[in-house]
C-alpha cells in the first residue's frame, strides 16, 4: 500500500469494552434506550477519570491503564502517517452535563497528546514525522460541537505548532449527520484536512462529503464483506442468495 496510513487513538476500542456500550454507538437514538447502550458500573470493563482510562481485559481479567501519553507512545511505535489524539467517546444518551464534562476532558487530553507527540518526535529526529489530528466531540449539541472545534484550534505545543488536521468523532444522529458535521466544519480551518471517524454507509458518505468532510474510516465495510454482503448503486444485498449464484455481473 503506497498511500497514507492512519491509526486511531484507542479511545473507541477501550471505551467500547465497558464505559460502556452494550450494543452499539447508536446513530438512531429514537430506537434505543439508555440501558441498551450504557452498562451499569459493575458491568463496565472501563472506567474514565480526568487522567485517563483504567480497563479490565475481557480476555484474562488483567488491569491496564491508558492515558493520552500511552496512546501517543503506541501510535508512534506503530508508525502510521496520521495519528489521532486520545479522546473520550460518548453516546447520544449520555446526559448534557456529562457531555460538557467530556468535551472539557477531551480538550485537556488533546493538549497532553500534542505535548507528548512533540517530545516523541524530537526524540527520534531521523524518523518521518507523523501528522497528529485533534478530535472534535460534543455529541448532538451544536454549542458543544462548535466549542470543541474552536478549542482545538487554540491548542499548540511548546513550539507553537498546532494540530495537523482534525477528526470529527463521537456518536452522530443519522438523520442529522450532515448538520452536525457542518457545525464542526464551520469552526475548523479550511487549510487543514477534516476526517470523519466511524462512518461508512454510502448515503452517510455522500451527506458528509457535501458537508465538508475529506476522509473517513470505519470497520463496517470489512464486516459487511465478511458476512457476504456488498453495496451497490441500488443498495446492499447478500451475494449468497440463490438468485446470485450464477450472477457474475
Positions of PLM-derived features:
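Glycine-rich phosphate/ribose-binding loops and adjacent secondary-structure elements
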Residues: 104-107, 116, 120-123, 127-249
